[in-house]
C-alpha cells in the first residue's frame, strides 16, 4: 500500500507541474549539484530553464539543494537569476527560471565587443547581497553566472548563500568541499571560521570576484597561482583586481566601491545604466542621451540591443517627441527580431507613427523602410499602413519623391484593389509641377509592372509611358523610353507596331542626342522582336495564296515564262499601289515585257522595218488614266468626308500637346520616263518660274504615291496586318477648312503632323488611365506631304484616308 501511495503522490506532483522538461544542457554537467534542462511552459509554449535535483542519487547534498531552492524563491534583484516557479517532491526538486545561457559558452563572443565585459562585471546584485542583505554568496565563479536574453549577467548558484556570522549556519562550513579549491579564499582553505565570522560579509565573495575577473580576460583558471598574471587584465582594472586578493579580509574590495571604479566609466556601461533609470530622467537628459546613442549602437551586442535598448526606444517614441533621426537606430535594431516578435513589439508603433502629422518622423519612416518592410504582412500594409502612406503624394516635394520610391518596396505586398488606387495617384503625379516627381513616377511605374495583373498592364502602361514621352523634361523622356524597353515582354506584336513604335519614333528627331540614341536602341529592340515572331502569329494572306497557286499552274520548264511572270507579278503588285506617273524604271520594264504588246519585227516579209511604238500615245493614255483615277478618288474622298468617325480615339493621359517643329529637308522626286507630269523641287523662291510644273503638281496632288516597300516573301504578312489596322476608322484631319502656309525653305519632314490646332484640347475628359481599349481618345495623326509645292494646294479641302490596299510609310520617293 505504501508503494501505491508514493506512486500516487508522484503522479499528482507530475500532473501539477505546468512545465515540460526538455533536454539536458551538456555544458553544465559536472559543474553543480543541479542538472540544467531547457523547457517550455505547457500553457503557452514559452521557453524556460529548469534546474532539477535528484534526491535519491544525492541524499548527502540535499541540505545544499534545499538551501538553494529557498534562496532562489526569496531573493529578488535585477542581477539575480529570475525565479519563475518551483516544485519539491519526494524524489526531485525543480527550480524554473527565465531562459538563460551559460557564461562559459558566451565569453568568446562577448570579448569581441569593447567594454562588454565591464557591463557584466557591473554587479549590483552582489553588492545587494553583501551590503543590503548581509549575506555571503560563497560560490562566485563563471559556472554560477548566467546570461539572459537581454545580455545581462545574472547571479545563480545560490546554494551556499548564508550569513557566515551566524554560528548555527553550517552550510558553507559543512559543504565547502563542493567548491573548487582554486576559487576558495585562504581562510576557507585553512578553515579559519572564527576569522570569517569577524570579517565583512563580502570578504569571501571579493576573493572569488577577483577570480571571475581573471577568467573573463584569460579563460578558465587551472590553479590558484594563475591570479598573479596581470598581462590580459585592463590597466583601469588593476587596482580593483589587486585589492580583491588582499591578505587582510577587511582590506578587500567592497562590491559597492567596485561600482565606482574608473573601469566602468565608458560609453557601454553609461548607456545601459541610463536606460535602466530612464524613467527618472527629465526631457532634456533624454534628448541628449538619444543624440549620442546612434553613434555607439554598433558597439553593443545585438541581444542587449534587442531586449534592453529597443523597449526603451519604442516607449520613448510612443510617449513623446524625440529626435526622428533616432528612428533609424530603432528600426535597425528591430530588423533583427523574428516576424512574430516584430509584429507584437514594433508593428503597432509603426502604424501609429505613419498616422502622425510629424513630417520629419514620416520622412525617416520612408527612408528606413528597407529595415522593416520584410516584417510587415500584406494585411497590415494594405489595411493600416498604405492609407497613411499615400498622403505623402499630396505633401511637399520631398515627401512626394520618398513616397514614390517607397512604392518599390510596398508593391510586392499590395493587393489588386490597392494597386489600382496607387496607379490613380501615379496618373496625377505624371502631371505634377516638379520635374523630378514626374520622372521618378515613370521610373517607379516601369519597375512595379511585374506586380500588376494583365488587364491593368494593357490599360495603363502604353498611355502612361506615352505621356512621359511628351514631357519637356529630358530625363522624363529618357525614363519613358527605358520603361518601354524594360516592359517589352508585356506588349503584343500589334501593340508594338501600332502603338509603341509610333510613339517612340517621335524621339528619333529629338534635339537631345541621348534621347535620340535611346530611341534608336529601343526601336531596334522592338523591330527585332517583331521580325522574330511575326511569321509565327500571322496567317498567309489570300494574295500570297493566290500567288502560290498561280505559280503551280505555270510551266517550270519554260524560262521565258518564269521570267515574264516574275516581272509581271512585280508590275501588277506595284501598279495596284502606285499611280502611273511614278517609278519610271518599273513602267519601262512593263512596256518591254508586256505580253499584250505586239513584238517589234525588225525584218518582215515586205523588207522594211515596222514603225516603233508611239511613245506619245502611251503618255497621253497614261495622262487620261491619271485624270480618271483622280476623279474617282475625289468622289470617294468627298463621301468619306461626309461620314462621321464611329469612335473618337484618345489616350487617357492627356492631349497630344507635344509636336516636334518641322525640320528643314529637301526632297527630290524621281523623274518618270513614262509620264509627262514630272515634279522637280527646283522652285526655291516665290517667283513665277516653272509655274507650269507647280500647276501640274497642284492638279494632281492627290496622285502622289506613298512609299511602298519592295514586295517580298513577307508581303502577305504585312498586308494581313494592314488589313487589320485599316478596320479601325480613321479620323479626319480637320473638320473645318484650315489654311496653312509654309516658308519655302521649311519643307515638312516625314514626322511632321498636319492637325487642326484648335482640336488640341478636345476630349480631355480622361479619368487618368484612358478607355478600356487602352487607346484613349487621341486623334490619329497622319503623315503630311513633304514637298514645298504644298503651299499652293493645302488651302483646299483635303481628306487623307488609308485604303485597304495602301500601306502607310514614313516618307516619299
Swiss-Prot record:
Domain of life of the organism encoding this protein: Eukaryota
Comp. bias intervals (Low complexity): 583-606, 614-637, 712-722, 748-768
Acidic residues composition bias: residue spans: 681-695
Residue numbers spanned by region Disordered: 539-566, 583-790
Domain annotation Protein kinase: ranges: 1-264
HEAT repeat extents: 340-378, 380-416, 417-454, 456-493, 494-532
Alphabetized UniProt keyword annotations: Repeat
Key word Repeat present: yes
Composition-biased stretches (Basic and acidic residues): 696-705
GO molecular function: ATP binding; protein kinase activity
Pfam families: Pkinase
Biased composition (Polar residues): 548-566, 664-674
Family: Belongs to the protein kinase superfamily. Ser/Thr protein kinase family.
Domains as described in the record: The protein kinase domain is predicted to be catalytically inactive.
Protein name per its UniProtKB record: Probable inactive serine/threonine-protein kinase scy1
Record organism: Dictyostelium discoideum (Social amoeba)
Gene behind this protein: scy1
